[in-house]
Structures are given as C-alpha cells and as structure tokens.
Amino acid sequence: MLYWALIFLIVAIVAGLFGFRGVASAATGIAKVLFFLFIVMFIVLLVFSLLGGTPEPVVIVKP
C-alpha cells in the first residue's frame, strides 16, 4: 500500500509541474488537490508502517 501511495504522490507532483508551467492550466486545481491528498496518505501510511510492526505468524495445527 505504501508503494502505491508513493506512485500516486509522484504522479501528482508531475501533474502539478505541468499544470503550473501552463501546459495544462486547467489541471492545476486538480493537481493541487491530488498533491495534498497523497501527501496526507503518505504520512498516514508511513506512520502505520512504522508503528505497526510485524504480525505474529499463524500456526496451523493439524489433528
């Protein structure tokens, strides 16, 4: 999940750069929203990843 948050963050940054340079001025507002949305998602997922630890292994007991 953290992988996808990073991918979408990069896409939002690239879209923002194109939008601010005038190539796609209509996409500027959308790029701003996406940028901040994915920054928040990145921070939340990073905190969950750091605080979550590793889950305990599941032990299957066969009768």
From Swiss-Prot:
Record flagged with keyword Cell membrane: yes
Domain of life, per lineage: Bacteria
CC terms in the record's Gene Ontology section: plasma membrane
Keywords carried by this UniProt record: Cell membrane, Membrane, Transmembrane, Transmembrane helix
Keyword Membrane attributed: yes
InterPro entries linked to this entry: DUF1328
Listed transmembrane segments: 4-24, 33-53
Compartments, as annotated in UniProt: Cell membrane
Cross-referenced Pfam families: DUF1328 (PF07043)
Membrane topology: Multi-pass membrane protein
Family note: Belongs to the UPF0391 family.
NCBIfam families tied to this protein: PRK13682.1-3, PRK13682.1-4
Protein name in UniProt: UPF0391 membrane protein lpg2415
Species for this entry: Legionella pneumophila subsp. pneumophila (strain Philadelphia 1 / ATCC 33152 / DSM 7513)
Lineage per the UniProt record: Bacteria, Pseudomonadati, Pseudomonadota, Gammaproteobacteria, Legionellales
